[in-house]
Amino acid sequence: MAFQLALDALSSTTHRDSISAPLLDSSVSQLQSSLELFPYTVPKELVPQLNRMGIQVSGLTSTPHPHAAHKTLELNLLFNHWAKSCNVDSAVVFMKPSKFFKLQEKNSHFKSLHNYRLHPHDSNRYPHPSTSLPTEKRFYIHDSLMYFTPHQISGLFESCPNLLSLYASLVVPPESSMTDLSLNPDLYRYSIHKSTLHYTPEGHSAGSYNQPVNALDWLKISAIQTPSLSLSVSVLESWGPLHSLLIERSSQTQNPDSQKIKDLISFQTPQALILPNPDSLAVPLRHRLVPQKTYDALFTYTRATRTLRTSDPAGFVRTQSNKPEFNWVTSQAWDNLQTYALLTASYRPPVSYTLHRSPLTKLKELLTRNALKLAAMASPALTLAIFTTMTALNTNSSKALSFSALKIHLLNPLTGPELLHFQTSVLQQKNSAPLSQAEAKQELDKSAVPAPSEHDSSASQSTSLSLSASSQLLSTEKHPGSELSSKAIPVSTSCPSASKQLAPPLTAESHSSVNALLRKFLGPNSPQSNLDNYNLHLHPESFTLGWKRRPLLLDSHSSFLPSSCLQPPASPSIAAAPHPLPPAQKPPRPPTTVPTPKPLASPSQTQAAQPATQSPPSIPQTAPVTSLLPAPLETDDSCAGPISTFQDLFPASYYPHTANFPCRSKIPGYLEAPYPPLDCMLVALSAQMPQSPQELWSALNTLMPLSALTSPSLRVLGLGTEELTALSYYYHFQAEIHSDNEIYRFGIQTASTKLCLIRDSGPPAHFTAPDPLRAGSPPSRSQTNENSLRRSLLGFRLNGNLLPIDQVHSFTSEPSRAKNLASNMKNGFDGILTTLAALSSLSSGPSPRDRIFTLDGICDFALPKTVDLIHLSGFAGCGKTHPIQQLLKTPHFHNFRVVTPTTNLRSEWKSDMALPAHHNWRFSTWESALLKHAEILVIDEIYKLPRGYLDLSLIADPTVKLVILLGDPLQGEYHSTSAHSSNLRLSSEIPRLLPFIDYYCYWSYRVPKCVAKLFSLPCFNPSEGFIKTTLDFFPSANNLVNSHSVVHISEACGWNAVTISSSQGCTFSDPAFIHLDRNTALLSPSNCLVALTRSRSGVYFKGDFTFLSSLSGSSRMFSLAYSGQPIHLPDFFPEIVFQLNMITAPLTKRSSSFRSGFQPNISSAPKIPAPPNLPCPPHIPTNYSKDVIVNNQALYGESLERRLSVLHLPPTRMTLHSDINITAPSSSSFQPSDEPVPSDHTAVYPGFDFFTLAAHFLPAHDPEVKEIELKDQTSQQFPWLNLDFHISCQTSSLISARHQPGSDSTLLPASLHKRLRFRPTAAPYQITPSDSFLGNCLYRSWCQVYRRDPNVRLPFNEALFLECIAVNDYAQLSSKTQATIVANASRSDPDWRHTFVKIFAKSQHKVNDGSIFGPWKACQTLALMHDYVILTLGPVKKYQRLFDQLERPSHIYYHAGNTPHDLRRWCSKHLETSHCTTNDYTAFDQSQHGEAVVFEVLKMRRLSIPENLISLHVHLKTNVETQFGPLTCMRLTGEPGTYDDNTDYNLAVLNLQYDLRKTPTLVSGDDSYLSGTLSPRSNWPFVKELLHLRLKPSSLIDGLFCGYYLGPQGCIRNPLALFAKLMIAEDDGSAFDKLPSYLTEFSIGHGLGDSLWQLLPSDLVLYQSACFDYFCRKATRSQKILLQPGLVDQETLDKIALSAKFISRPFYSMLSSHARSLISTKFKLDSSLTTLQDPMVEFELLPFSNVQ
């Protein structure tokens, strides 16, 4: 600690480097050795675990490995543990030769290597098998002990007489003795299948292996004894699942004292405890194991909160269950924990504390406690009868315990240390001989129980003595873990003579035994028993995993190896191989391919004599990809009952499969959904029915759930066939839909009424009524012939499967997109056709260059063209091309042409189609295809073509009738090679073509199984495949590179290479070689996906392997693929995947469900979930209290308890509230001022008509000129259409910009660049030396103004801080309505990171001098923070504010918490002149950087705020993230203490610029007013350059502060702004509601009398008079009291406020606390009023007397 203090003291001095040099020197060597020994990248969450195990892992390595932590454990075992213990010549068994030679280089005592092929996989791992056993005195068996039994190991010692000791590594989870769920799932997982344990290291399924489940027996035996051999078994070390064992021949002489020490062993487990079993139920121990910290915190929480609801324990558990350190806890355990806490919350210790008890009281307690004992002694007959019964029950047992020992148990049944002493005394009588072989088998299975603590009664129960029947009757209820007691060792066998000791006659001891028995059955228990039972259940001991090891006695031994392994091989070539390997021999040269490192213990490397059967890994079947969004039908409040189908709820004879959609019963009389904007179906039906569209909609509301009638699909796409089916049931009709020359039938089959709807596919699709002349007849034959291609497409089948489309869409071209591409081609920026002008001399027609120029001219006058279009899309290799190729071979589709992006893909089409040579013109690359014509246009890999190519193709070929698109939106897009091309400026084709993708085929015939497993992809390729690295370069291989420059270099060297982007669409039979270089990190996820999915056989990575390290700067997708981890497509393509309707099997039938909007309803019917067991009410009122189980009132304090209801709080937020009552009364209360009235007469006004001035106030102008455009959208800050006005030529709302985020979609995006400052990366903001220097300057300047010593630190006042916590809770509960808090329940969601802030725009119409007649203005951004931040740091700011209010000099004025009257009084007292200096800032909040954080930290440390709160504040400020990106540590409106920190920062900056120690100064946020004309300090120019602020000071006579003109006479509201507000209110009709607030503001200056004219500039006299004229005309008699001379009493102000519907900030500040409380519950407060309320609440509630 002393060294740390020295480091902290010298860290900011010139001695920093000198004192830290020794630390650096000692760390360098350790770091270097760690990097060399452990080179693999261990997951960051496992690094602390390995460090706690004593393994020096740095976490700075970069070599990837699929299970790096296990590899690190193995390296530590070999090169640290074994290498240091090997001090004699030793042999190593079962190890790769390469690994052995590395170990031999580390320690030369490792002399020989012996491997034996016991499994087919061993032939690959062990190239030189041994044929004999080693001869050394010490063996090292590497990761194979779990495959050998004690019989075989004893046989090894018998076969090797020279063998003295054997070191062996064992991989087995210790907790497998009690559960099949891992206690460390980050490190390993396992499952148990009968006698096999399947082990998976670090989630790497490919590295999982099987081993015998009884391998755990090695950790339970302490010795192996045979008739001729004695071996001791020692567990040297345990590193999680890896254990190092030493088996050696026992010494002839042993210390006799060692036999008295129990051989107990324990293992490292999470800090946990075991919950008790429920009454009469048995829950597995694994599901009762919970974190100890969570249990202790929940135990305290349920007893500390005053109002505990049934949901609060579950809410508390939720705040803990998502923590990564608790991922070992099962969901059942969390459920049991919250249930247990809920049901035991009311239990309290059965104790009492009474002082000065009299002897008589003690005697009464003694008699009461021993009443049954006295009764038993008084009735010998009863005693004899009971004891005779107990003796008779024991006669069936041949062996029993002595009564003298049993009486202790009867007197104190299973309580206290006495029982443990009793059981220990009995256990000492047991023979300590080793277990026999049969007993050992049973014993090893029974001994694996959680190790008890010394004084745990449950521990003694876990040994479970087999007592007599009487003792069993006296046993208490089961304790956690007691279900294991039936498996423990019987001890009664150790007392052969116990039955003879039951003969003594009855004595007083027997009376005591009967007393205990009667108490057990009749009750009550003794007070001590009750207390012990309470502690046993509610304070259980910590969980410890361990057991007692026992010796094992064997009758015989088995051979260590099969006889076949020790026979010389028959082959001469193999027999010639040396055996064993000599130490000097080097391993053969390794292959050039870099092998994937092996797991810590795999079956292939550690198979033994009888290995467990190894089954090859198989890829699990993947479920179909379903929607990630839950259906809202489950939570629909308008329904009742479970989810069912419409056909089940409303039975009728519907057409098949038309009424199977999910539905619920509608509650009668529920609110009706608003009429839909897209009502073409209702209009079409109404034309054929007597009902109007509104009546049809009302009928739907009686049947359909509200969620279905307000769904986004219905609002955006219109009504569909589900609504048509519901109407058919209501009105009993059947309907026919004629769509794309097909007829679909819906409704009631037996209905006599038949309706017809004509559906136009669009876009947008549309329902219409049939032409009356046709009378609903189907389309004519001529129309059917014209659409024969559509019918053929929809009916085409290949191998019984349909094309993956749902309909034939209509596509309309955009000539502007075609013109862009044609211009770029003409100028040579895209394509090469313009370079082919020389070919014109070889042909009679125009050259390609001329034809492109002609096409460019045609685009200038081209009109949009509509054609039929289908889009086949799917994963790489899903078979999009093959069905289209078969379709084109049919007669209907013979007139086609195919467009491909590359020549390679064109060649594949030619070979697959196998057409005659004269048809080769039908296959073209994208440029030459523009010069050809055909009715059917097929475009393969559409997204690899330039943007606008589809539009240009339709203009170039007017004969096209049908377009077939093939492509995958997840793969790469086209990118021009010319920097001058403007094609990139067009919008992407992906969002444009996504609506035409009906289905996305999510399977593959191409990729091998190992690649398909990464994407959870159904795979039809039988090849397993591989993903490896290689150091070789094969010139003729399929080399995929990142850039064209590498391609050119490769071609110059004669090597085959193609860019990853160019390979899209190609299929390789041979492996794909992916080249890694610095451009790999720049690859998009689309290109990475292309590279991984080209080959049928596998993937090789070559080049720079650091890009596979999963670190910053590497390729994430490549890293995941190489490590075998799953690749989730939504993580890489979130904007695309969620819009795709994925299918995982070929389409065999199509849905006939339609909607009138753009897309049909193509999704399959969702699965209907089972009805819930306990349905909750649809709405829970905020005052619902029936779920409250504990409601404690304050025991002391004021008569009126200052507590607000917390019943409406979300359970996750309830845990954040302290629920501390404010008990200390405030020593300061608000008293009305006794100062004289400002003026006893009313001012004389030069009368001026308000409406006359208002008529000419607003200049005539075009408001649209002030608007801005953002992404083709116009802002809406000056709306004027359909707005009423009557006092001027335009609506008065045009006076200033209005911010309405709901109606202005450009408001927030256009304001971001001005209101927010972003960090360049996601890394935290780093405090610079300049920030530290400037922050100290600001702090000293601020202390100078307050006349404080900056070096003084005040002691922390804990009692006062508790009061601040209570006030903060009170303010958070009272500042918002209960409904608002419920609606924002997500703010306390534990899944919301507390460093994440949601930014949204503030809705306001700000009217002041700066905004009147101003231009477009950026909105104010508000930050929505987590409740944890507000409730944790809020008390800190209130604590600081309290000290600042008390110590603030009188000449410094902070406006927060003060009323306009307070401002007037302060001005009258301190201001001597109207001359002033004001200041304005540019981007005040955004310009506060690291220096503001340093300043805030120094302010908190001055008051000794706890360091954990300071660290939290710094962490939040430097790590803020938003939905738009990471922010700098700027000031955010919404963070705790925004106003205080802004005001302090402003004051500190002003004092750096001017000397304010004696200058009257008013500050409020970024606003300031300095009395007089001041001169800057001499050092101000230097300090100014360090600040990021841009100041705009000005000296003038009439200065504004917070909207008021100030002077020695007082203050007056700016009449210009007030006049503008009155105009706006008069025009929009809200003047009646707002008049009380505006009148109150006006009365502040009006009360000054004639002196008010001295404060106003002369040009504002007319506006003051006009305002007075308006109030005289419009104010009521009661409101005009405010205009009378003198001060208005508080009661009158409160009455006026409570009757108003609008409260302004100044008016709100003058109200009483009672009125403010009523107003806050009456309607939602504005955020400005919320911030104003905090200091007022503190003024009334905080005990100022506590401050010393």
Swiss-Prot record:
Entry similarity comment: Belongs to the Tymoviridae non-structural replication polyprotein family.
Domain Peptidase C21 per the UniProt entry, residue ranges: 627-781
Entry EC number(s): 2.1.1.-, 3.4.22.-, 3.6.4.-, 2.7.7.48
Annotated positions binding ATP: G874, F875, A876, G877, C878, G879, K880, T881
TM segment ranges: none
Organism of derivation: Erysimum latent virus
Annotated keywords: ATP-binding, Host-virus interaction, Hydrolase, Methyltransferase, Modulation of host ubiquitin pathway by viral deubiquitinase, Modulation of host ubiquitin pathway by virus, Multifunctional enzyme, Nucleotide-binding, Nucleotidyltransferase, Protease, RNA-directed RNA polymerase, Thiol protease, Transferase, Viral RNA replication
Residues covered by the RdRp catalytic domain: 1474-1580
Location of region: Disordered: 433-507, 569-633, 767-786
Compositional bias of kind Pro residues: 579-600
Name of the protein: Non-structural replication polyprotein
Pfam family, one: Vmethyltransf
Residues at the site labelled Cleavage: A775, G776, S1156, G1157
Low complexity biased stretches: 458-475, 601-616
A biological process from GO: proteolysis
Domain (+)RNA virus helicase C-terminal: 1002-1138
